[in-house]
């Protein structure tokens, strides 16, 4: 049986789409994950095609051992949310996935400036680990929900283990899964190592 989403979507989440949408798609992702990068334009297109029928939620699941820049990228997106609200988060989210090959701290600060936010404030937040607890909370909620790789998707609080690589199939599967709970073998994820640590503790 598929593991359900243990932490319900709430006011702390980053949400795009209407609250009364019939389908809620939750992604546990990693900004440095190759597969998440491949999924990004597909998810964007699915959201566009489904319009008001879908609500999209992004949660952090940085695989620190495999992706050394992922944690700071996640923290930078949280800092952007703190400065610019929901719009700030999604603008940074898009910048990070559009520039996966350049995620050093200097790059992160440049993206912050490009979306019109205070890069100095984000630099200070990264140095102090201000938003590390927020990222860690997402990570832990993913572990409790059976997440062991990225990207991992949940459709209406049930894990979706089908293929997301084909946009048409993914769109159809999201709607089918919402109605019938149909499942397929998992395809295309970066897997968390057995001994992978959680994101770093507070500084």
Residue ranges and their predicted role:
Residues 16-18, 26, 49, 146:
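Generic structural signal for beta-strand residues in well-ordered domains
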Residues 26, 31-113, 184-200:
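Structural alpha/beta surface segment adjacent to cysteine/selenocysteine redox centers
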Residues 1-4:
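N-proximal helix/coil linker or "cap" segments that precede and/or mark the start of modular domains
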Residues 15-16, 103, 160:
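Short clusters of hydrophobic/aromatic residues that line enzyme substrate/ligand-binding pockets
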Residues 28-29, 40-45, 110-203:
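C-terminal cap of thioredoxin/glutaredoxin-like
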Residues 6-23:
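A short beta-strand-turn-helix
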């Amino acid at each position: 049986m598929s593991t359900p989403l243990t932490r319900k979507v709430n006011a702390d989440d980053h949400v795009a789409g209407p609250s009364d949408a019939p389908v809620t798609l939750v992604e546990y992702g990693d900004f440095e994950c190759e597969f998440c990068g491949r999924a990004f334009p597909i998810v964007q297109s699915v959201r566009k095609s489904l319009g008001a029928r879908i609500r999209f939620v992004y949660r952090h699941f940085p695989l620190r051992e495999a992706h050394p820049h992922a944690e700071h990228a996640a923290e930078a997106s949280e800092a952007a949310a703190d400065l610019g609200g929901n719009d700030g988060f999604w603008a940074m989210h898009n910048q990070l996935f559009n520039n996966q090959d350049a995620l050093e701290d200097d790059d992160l600060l440049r993206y912050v400036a490009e979306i019109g936010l205070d890069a100095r404030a984000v630099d200070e937040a990264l140095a102090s680990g201000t938003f590390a607890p927020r990222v860690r909370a997402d990570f832990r909620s993913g572990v409790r929900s059976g997440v062991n790789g990225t990207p991992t998707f949940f459709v209406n609080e049930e894990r979706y283990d089908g293929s997301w690589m084909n946009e048409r199939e993914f769109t159809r599967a999201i709607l089918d899964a919402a109605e019938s709970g149909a499942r397929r073998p998992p395809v295309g994820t970066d897997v968390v190592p057995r001994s992978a640590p959680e994101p770093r503790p507070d500084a």
